[in-house]
Amino acid sequence: MEKLTILLLVAAVLMSTQAMFQGGGEKRPKDKIKFLSKRKTNAESWWEGECLGWSNGCTQPSDCCSNNCKGRNCDIW
């Protein structure tokens, strides 16, 4: 029984090292992580202060929750 336990532990270590080498052992770039992560709705982004609601001042479309910057203010949608 002890030999079986040791054999299973050795197999687990070998498999984990093999997986590490096949994967390159590197962390994924942040771009890939952002792409694979859950995207927030416009309301969630606004609630957490990550974007501006309508009629707020903006300089570029990404400032607005609606991604619509008309003139100097965020448009509704």
Swiss-Prot record:
GO molecular function, one term: toxin activity
Subcellular location: Secreted
Entry superkingdom: Eukaryota
Cystine pairs: 51-65, 58-69, 64-74
Annotated GO CC locations: extracellular region
Record family assignment: Belongs to the conotoxin O2 superfamily.
Domain remarks: The presence of a 'disulfide through disulfide knot' structurally defines this protein as a knottin. The cysteine framework is VI/VII (C-C-CC-C-C).
Protein name: Conotoxin Vc6.14
Species this chain originates from: Conus victoriae
Organism taxonomic ancestry: Eukaryota, Metazoa, Spiralia, Lophotrochozoa, Mollusca
